[in-house]
Amino acid sequence: MAATKASTATDEPVKRTATKSPAASASGAKTGAKRTAAKSASGSPPAKRATKPAARSVKPASAPQDTTTSTIPKRKTRAAAKSAAAKAPSARGHATKPRAPKDAQHEAATDPEDALDSVEELDAEPDLDVEPGEDLDLDAADLNLDDLEDDVAPDADDDLDSGDDEDHEDLEAEAAVAPGQTADDDEEIAEPTEKDKASGDFVWDEDESEALRQARKDAELTASADSVRAYLKQIGKVALLNAEEEVELAKRIEAGLYATQLMTELSERGEKLPAAQRRDMMWICRDGDRAKNHLLEANLRLVVSLAKRYTGRGMAFLDLIQEGNLGLIRAVEKFDYTKGYKFSTYATWWIRQAITRAMADQARTIRIPVHMVEVINKLGRIQRELLQDLGREPTPEELAKEMDITPEKVLEIQQYAREPISLDQTIGDEGDSQLGDFIEDSEAVVAVDAVSFTLLQDQLQSVLDTLSEREAGVVRLRFGLTDGQPRTLDEIGQVYGVTRERIRQIESKTMSKLRHPSRSQVLRDYLD
């Protein structure tokens, strides 16, 4: 029976003859088992070839001699597979764990005829992953098992014997379900259910809740500081620029702005540039944007240094920085490098202008016009200077003299400068009282007066019930007892369809009845 094997010198198959002698049969069976393990180590499935039914007849004399195959232990078969995998690295660039299928090992150990036929089938298709020119020693069966156990992980036997795909699928299914179950368990532990709360098993720790509230309050207070710290750390990564670098970036920005303007004008006129020229113009525009961003990022620290001067005036520090950044963008767009000044000198004025304008528009609860804000700032500056010179608070006349305005105008400006405060503002170190608790409400109704007024209404109603319907109606409309709005005689006459004189007569007659002691006595107590 002939089998083919790839030659080490050439890729052409070379035929060789497999004899059926007893020694060759035993060697062939052993070689077949080792090649089966080697094929498993290289990643190809040898079990299909090893389990094929024997299609050729085998001589009876060679069968008893093949029982030497059954004396090969499983561990030695695995050791041979490990050695073969180490000597024959895969040409495909990947390596897998040595794994011998159970079916191939079982047939190699129990059926010599099938093992011999497996050797013939493997020899017929020599597709072992061996590098050309490299010899694979398949007869090296005497390996040191102690050394092999040191090299292989303790669970190598389990890996070699785990060829059942169903076990792997079960493990994968369990692994897929485990994270979800763990998450559910965590949620149940972290968040007590409504049933637990209702049953009384869940006990709320007051000390812990107070600590959490205090920690949350501290976090809110430090949130702004943390944001500023993170922002300063981020902008500090950009290196500062020298004068030459600023001029170079300014030239690139100018070229980008010019290219953008030119393309916009051509687009408005409906003209189209050639593809190559349009591509160059687009590149110049993008380069100008990159230079603009670089110049901006390198001067963000200038904005922070200027914004520090305006803290404590009604705007948060981060808001001042953002408004200053808008002024910095404006300065980058209008910077003229031909003047010979540094960019920071020019940008400072734009940053200050943006910050002061934002404070005038956003810092106050009630917005004040920008020109009045400038007057208020000037008055405050003069007031501080006079305080240092005189050692006392200046009078309105002294302020008016310095500002060249009237004292009345100074008082008016000082009224505008006042800022409203919240009635919910806390008072004291403990913060348990609010400002509104100490301010009297002059329009609030006193409880005693409210009760007295209610009793007076009841007494008036009882007295008016003793009069006729027209008389009681005229009195109610004349004195506004119903809605608090008194009516004239003409208005009452229009209501009843009579003249104003008739309404006057009814009023006079009704008042005489009300002055009778039987009616007026119950109302005299409310005159005090």
UniProtKB/Swiss-Prot annotation:
Compositionally biased intervals (Basic and acidic residues): 100-109
SUPFAM superfamilies with a match to the protein in the record: Sigma2 domain of RNA polymerase sigma factors, Sigma3 and sigma4 domains of RNA polymerase sigma factors
GO cellular component, one term: plasma membrane
MF (Gene Ontology): DNA binding; sigma factor activity
Stretch list, region Sigma-70 factor domain-2: 295-365
UniProt free text on domains: The sigma-70 factor domain-2 mediates sequence-specific interaction with the -10 element in promoter DNA, and plays an important role in melting the double-stranded DNA and the formation of the transcription bubble. The sigma-70 factor domain-2 mediates interaction with the RNA polymerase subunits RpoB and RpoC.
NCBIfam families hit by this protein: PRK05901.1-1, PRK05901.1-3, PRK07921.1, RpoD_Cterm, sigma70-ECF
Segments of this protein annotated with the region Sigma-70 factor domain-1: 225-259
Subcellular location: Cytoplasm
Organism of provenance: Mycobacterium tuberculosis (strain ATCC 25618 / H37Rv)
Signal peptide (residue range): none
Amino acid composition bias (Low complexity), ranges on this chain: 19-31, 38-56, 80-92
Family: Belongs to the sigma-70 factor family. RpoD/SigA subfamily.
Biased composition (Polar residues): 1-10
UniProt KW keywords: Cytoplasm, DNA-binding, Sigma factor, Transcription, Transcription regulation
Biased composition (Acidic residues): 110-173
Principal subcellular localisation of the protein: cytoplasm
Region of interest (Sigma-70 factor domain-3), ranges: 374-450
Name of the molecule in the record: RNA polymerase sigma factor SigA
CDD domains noted in UniProt: Sigma70_r4
